[in-house]
Amino acid sequence: DRDYFRIVSSAAVREHDKHHILKYLDPDVEFKDVTEDYACLGVFGPKSRSLMTDMAGKYFANEDFPFGTSKNIKILNITVWAQRLSYVGELGWELYIPIENAKIIYEKIIQDGKKYQI
């Protein structure tokens, strides 16, 4: 959707960033802070692509999901916003999950990750 985007920033500077955005926001643009609506879980490491493929039922190849991109995926029929990035120097994804589904997705990561010693 070209009329929609997300800004992800550190929890430590959430209020600072929010204030800065609102200060310069065009009056025709709606700002909605959804921080409390989502949990973020990270899946990182050399086996992360295999685990993500198992959980989402798709192959997460470089050409299909390049570094620095994001897309909505389904895990257990739950829409999860996945971002391919890494702050740890390994292949990986951040998963933004509706807070009410965070526990079930976490349990899925742990269960399916056993196969990969995660």
Region locations from a protein language model:
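Basic, glycine/lysine-rich polyanion-binding surfaces/domains
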Residues: 1-118
